[in-house]
Amino acid sequence: MRTNPTTSSPVVSTLEEKNLGRIAQIIGPVLDVVFPPGKMPNIYNALVVKGRDTVGQQINVTCEVQQLLGNNRVRAVAMSATDGLMRGMEVIDTGAPLSVPVGGATLGRIFNVLGEPVDNLGPVDTRTTSPIHRSAPAFIQLDTKLSIFETGXKVVDLLAPYRRGGKIGLFGGAGVGKTVLIMELINNIAKAHGGVSVFGGVGERTREGNDLYMEMKESGVINEKNIAESKVALVYGQMNEPPGARMRVGLTALTMAEYFRDVNEQDVLLFIDNIFRFVQAGSEVSALLGRMPSAVGYQPTLSTEMGSLQERITSTKEGSITSIQAVYVPADDLTDPAPATTFAHLDATTVLSRVLAAKGIYPAVDPLDSTSTMLQPRIVGEEHYETAQRVKQTSQRYKELQDIIAILGLDELSEEDRLTVARARKIERFLSQPFFVAEVFTGSPGKYVGLAETIRGFQLILSGELDGLPEQAFYLVGNVDEATAKAMNLEVESKLKK
């Protein structure tokens, strides 16, 4: 779908054009504004409150119209703190929805929900803006061909492949490598697909947003020396923001991603961390607007809000937006309406395991819990499907045998089971991989492994051709040839020690 970017922001230019109203009521982040008869703003129009508070400080608050209440009154939700606002203050109707800067100038920069840069690097050098509210692409514009989105990470491409233009849920607690995996994907899409990424921080910790920015600069994903060569744009609406900002920041990030897809015709990665906070903010806004709550106190419009965001994330004939969304599961209850509504939209799930992270196997993707709708013979081909299933079966059998090994030891197993365990341990280590963005921590150069190479490697392990190699030869290597070379080096080293 072609976007219709404008070349000016929705701030009204001349005094005659200004549609002025006055604040009638303030309820936290919600404002009621009275306009002259016949001058009512449309739903989703941006309103701007400008003035001074009681101590003379300049106030500039942008709001979004949510309801038309009748009697020339509208109800709007503020995108920033409403401290210092007073009844009777003048409100300007901009006559258009919130619009944000789009295009190459956004790369390497950090924005808030309004598209204003918050990184102290000066204004954004672009006159092209786009409204955050747009309809999803029409059916005729969609690219319905099912194709794999190759990430270069062995465990993902083999066992839970991503769909081009699909939506992936990323599950994992603190410290299991979510951020590093996200940064590696940003790096790989730029190198292998010539694509860019947009990161939407929705309602998460400000410290995490800052850490991510610093780590991206350190790993080269954001190029400080030449900001235009950066591979990602960052949009933050963190925990301290009002619910209106947290509810809309996902749309701001999505709008920037849509421009890269529709106008620049690129493959785009859109990260949303965390999709649950988008629902949570919508729930807060819904209560403030006086709507009757639905199940578990969520907003009655939960499915509609989620659908309007998710349906814009898709492949068109121009390009694709592939979305990776971190999903927080409240109280580990997968039947909670928020995660349950999210699951309906996901094509794949990538589950990060603390047990694997503790073993030092990175990326710590759980091969048995991670799933994908793409892993079907008619989509990925018979060879890929069979290899993935055999890897899972071997890993599952190893998991079942672990209790017996812990109690009786490896010697009590049958010959066949011992062989299964040996191959499963090689597979477990071969699923690890050195990352480009982790070179600064590991000292090992990063590896991008193509899908064909990945399948070949696991087939050789499963067939028994590599049974003679030590399992440590498979740890943190790229393709299977590197594992063979590493085994030879280990053999030489052991002989020298003797």
Swiss-Prot record:
Gene3D superfamilies recorded for this chain? 2.40.10.170, Bovine Mitochondrial F1-atpase, Atp Synthase Beta Chain, Chain D, domain 3 (1.10.1140.10), P-loop containing nucleotide triphosphate hydrolases (3.40.50.300)
Q: Name one GO molecular function term.
A: ATP binding
**Catalytic activity as recorded in UniProt:** ATP + H2O + 4 H(+)(in) = ADP + phosphate + 5 H(+)(out)
Instruction: Extract the CDD domains matched here.
Output: ATP-synt_F1_beta_C, ATP-synt_F1_beta_N, F1-ATPase_beta_CD
Pfam families (UniProt xref): ATP-synt_ab (PF00006), ATP-synt_ab_N (PF02874), ATP-synt_VA_C (PF22919)
| GO terms, biological process | proton motive force-driven mitochondrial ATP synthesis
Q: Which InterPro entries match?
A: AAA+_ATPase, ATP-synt_VA_C, ATP_synth_F1_bsu, ATPase_a/bsu_AS, ATPase_alpha/beta_chains, ATPase_F1/V1/A1_a/bsu_N, ATPase_F1/V1/A1_a/bsu_N_sf, ATPase_F1/V1/A1_a/bsu_nucl-bd
Offer a single GO CC term for the protein: proton-transporting ATP synthase complex
For this chain, the family text in UniProt reads:
Belongs to the ATPase alpha/beta chains family.
Query: What is the annotated quaternary arrangement, including any partners?
Result: F-type ATPases have 2 components, CF(1) - the catalytic core - and CF(0) - the membrane proton channel. CF(1) has five subunits: alpha(3), beta(3), gamma(1), delta(1), epsilon(1). CF(0) has four main subunits: a(1), b(1), b'(1) and c(9-12).
PANTHER family attached here? ATP SYNTHASE, ATP SYNTHASE SUBUNIT BETA, MITOCHONDRIAL
What name does UniProt use for this protein?
Answer: ATP synthase subunit beta, chloroplastic
Gene source species? Caryota mitis
Q: What is the lineage of its organism?
A: Eukaryota, Viridiplantae, Streptophyta, Embryophyta, Tracheophyta
Q: Tell me the name of the encoding gene.
A: atpB
